Curated annotation (Swiss-Prot):
This is Lysine--tRNA ligase. GO terms for biological process: lysyl-tRNA aminoacylation. GO terms for molecular function: ATP binding; lysine-tRNA ligase activity; magnesium ion binding; tRNA binding. Keywords: Aminoacyl-tRNA synthetase, ATP-binding, Cytoplasm, Ligase, Magnesium, Metal-binding, Nucleotide-binding, Protein biosynthesis. The gene is lysS. Binds 3 Mg(2+) ions per subunit. Mg(2+) 2 binds at residue 420. Its EC number is 6.1.1.6. It catalyses: tRNA(Lys) + L-lysine + ATP = L-lysyl-tRNA(Lys) + AMP + diphosphate. PANTHER family: LYSINE--TRNA LIGASE, CHLOROPLASTIC_MITOCHONDRIAL, LYSYL-TRNA SYNTHETASE. It comes from the Bacteria. InterPro entries: Aa-tRNA-synt_II, aa-tRNA-synth_II, aa-tRNA-synth_II/BPL/LPL, Lys-tRNA-ligase_II, Lys-tRNA-ligase_II_N, Lys-tRNA-synth_II_C, NA-bd_OB-fold, NA-bd_OB_tRNA. Signal peptide: none annotated. Mg(2+) 1 binds at residues 413, 420.
Length: 502
């Protein structure tokens, strides 16, 4: 018999015993009571009483009602020490036969298993080792767990099981719970920041007839009642800018985007984005906003501007570097023989890209080639927080052209740790220019570029009514959460990441 078969046999045997215990509970009446009311959380009790002198605490006779999942138990004859875990942390229980009604210790507490959820009433005291503990006077089994905790709670180490059965991961791993608490604080902090700046939170369509706002491959579905194909949105941008046209001059949205593309440590097909738009601002203002926001999040969440990620360390208290795409490519491509002239001539750029092993697509113009060269030689060098400016207009179909050099745009991308975290720009509000760029995207799609944008004629009509000078930005919430939680994979910060079916 294999080791796996032995484990499955043991599991089946343990589950059978637990089901028999549940059957006995059902025979007594309500096996899943719902009348217990907790009045204290474990961590709150530790915060308030850990420093209290044991004798003084005993004299106070503080009564509490706590509840949680049984994580450990140590039986010592007529008494048992039990550790329960609630949403805030863990606390120890002292359950003694003599402190309970007759028969309860043997007939009730004696049948409890690891993983069961219990409600406890008792008084606080300190053990000889000075551990805050609840001396139990009343007990109630609230939920009988039919399956044991993973590996008797020695830890859940199988990464795939952690992702597929996140509930087990959260029960077993304090670090995972911390990660998702940090993620929640990131979202709450962003919302608080923008509301304090006078922005209005809005919601725009998830199902769109024309997917727009980014260059990506969309998910396609069909609306039966309307008999029309629809797309899960790849970005909310075009709808948010319609709202600015309508007079909502500061708007933001925290919501999901969907892109039918690859899965990696940095990519999940379903992900969360912040996207915001500010009228009468330009991309310089948004870079300032972003620095301020990330600095505030670091202080509020970590208590410091120093953010550690793996072996890297970032100081969000310092000004972020700002460099153009062309300058970064020349700076970090010098050891590969790249010079300025290679980035401003189509034939030289194409030859340079091919020399670097880049497969140049037929639909690419100079801007796309230069961007590919940048990604090959420079992107991974942008370790410290860096705003990359001056992206080619060809790859920025919604961004405003730079006044001094119309071949590039007033756009920035934020890189931290060699990864893109955010993307923003002064918005293109010239309806005729936008129409021409949409036509160029259509031509690229017809030439085989699956990620080229669809043309949204209604958006052009909206621009024809007049969009004030506006700047907008998108920030990846998942990647920000990875950063603040020091999580190596995007799957570590998404509660239920996309997984291949078994």
């Amino acid at each position: 018999m294999s080791e796996q078969e032995v484990k499955e046999l043991d599991l089946n045997g343990e589950m059978l015993v637990r089901r028999e215990k549940l059957a006995a509970l059902r025979a007594k009446g309500n096996a899943f009571p719902n009348k217990f009311r907790r009045d204290a959380l474990a961590q709150d009790l530790h915060n308030q009483y850990d420093a209290e002198d044991g004798e003084i605490l005993k004299e106070k006779g503080i009564e509490v009602q706590v509840a949680g999942r049984i994580m450990t138990r140590r039986a010592m004859g007529k008494a048992t020490f039990i550790t329960i875990q609630d949403m805030s942390g863990k606390i120890q229980l002292y359950v003694a036969r003599d402190n309970l009604p007759e028969g309860v210790y043997k007939d009730d507490v004696g049948t409890w298993d690891l993983g069961d959820i219990v409600g406890i009433k008792g008084t606080l005291f300190k053990t000889k080792t000075d551990e805050l503990t609840v001396k139990t006077t009343e007990v109630q089994l609230l939920t009988k767990a039919l399956r044991p905790l993973p590996d008797k709670f020695h830890g859940l180490t199988d990464q795939e099981v952690r992702y597929r059965q996140r509930y087990l991961d959260l029960i077993s791993n304090e670090e995972s719970r911390r990660t998702f608490i940090i993620r929640s604080k990131v979202v709450a902090g962003i919302r608080e920041y923008f509301i304090s700046k006078g922005f209005m939170e809005v919601e725009t369509p998830m199902l769109q007839v024309i997917p727009g706002g980014a260059s990506a491959r969309p998910f396609v579905t069909h609306h039966n009642a309307l008999d029309v194909d629809m797309y899960l949105r790849i970005a909310p941008e075009l709808y948010l800018k319609r709202l600015v046209v309508g007079g909502f001059e500061r708007v933001f949205e925290l919501n999901r985007n969907f892109r039918n593309e690859g899965v990696s440590v940095r990519h999940n097909p379903e992900f969360t984005m912040l996207e915001y738009y500010q009228a009468y601002a330009d991309y310089h203002d948004l870079m300032d906003n972003t620095e301020e926001l990330l600095r505030k999040l670091a202080i509020d969440i970590l208590g410091t501007t120093i953010v550690k990620y793996g072996d890297l360390e970032f100081d969000f208290g310092k000004p972020f570097e700002r460099i153009t795409l062309h300058d970064a490519t020349i700076k970090y491509g010098a050891d590969k023989g790249i010079v300025k002239e290679d980035l401003y001539d189509f034939d030289r750029a194409k030859a340079t890209a091919e020399r670097l092993g880049i497969e140049v697509q037929k639909s690419w113009g100079l801007g796309s080639i230069v961007n590919a060269i940048f990604e090959e030689v420079a992107e991974h060098h942008l370790i410290q927080p860096t705003f990359l400016n001056g992206s080619p207009a060809e790859i920025s179909p919604l961004a405003r052209r730079n006044d001094e050099n119309p071949e590039v745009t007033d756009r920035f991308e934020l890189f931290i740790g060699g990864r893109e975290i955010g993307n923003g720009f002064s918005e293109l509000n010239d309806a005729e220019d936008q129409n021409e760029r949409f036509d160029a995207q259509v031509a690229a799609k017809e030439a085989g570029d699956d990620e080229a944008m669809f043309k949204d004629e209604d958006f052009v009509v909206a621009l024809e009514h007049g969009l004030p000078p506006t700047a907008g930005e998108g920030l990846g919430i998942d990647r920000l959460a990875m950063l603040y939680a020091n999580a190596p994979s995007i799957r570590d910060v998404i509660l239920f990441p996309a997984m291949r079916q078994k």
